[in-house]
Amino acid sequence: MNSRLSNSVIKAEAQRLGFFACGMARAQKVDSTEERNLEQWLEQKGHADMQYMAKHKEVRLDPRLLLNGAKTIVSVALNYCPKVTIPQDEPQMAYYAYGLDYHDIVKQKLYALACNLGLHTDPKAARPEDQPFRVVVDTAPILERYWARQAGLGWQGKNRQLI
């Protein structure tokens, strides 16, 4: 297992796998502004009926609690725009709703990234909790947009989306 990889090697392999952006950030507690933003959002019930968003606040604020020993967060972006679109005269739907579930596609590519970087040799050989990494795609209590910003993938607009 390779425990020390350069950012350029990771980015090059991510690009080879089809990710159009990749960046890294040091795994650490979020800054005080982000912590206040999360607390206000929860107090104002910004999560509506998504009760799971109010759980595991400590983990959301410090990703090292999600994976013991975590040192780096690798954030990626993948364009899931379909190759074939619905004709304009037919009812439309969001691109992410086309075809295969993006969670599955991104997760598969992230496991391939780990394998190709020598972090993971056989996805079926060991339990995920035994790995030196953790793959998450909207499925863990982590502030994805914050970490994508920290990794240099964009900035957050007024709509709270990463641009």
Q: Residue spans of the language-model regions?
A:
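Auxiliary alpha/beta "docking" domains used to position bulky ligands
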Residues: 1-163
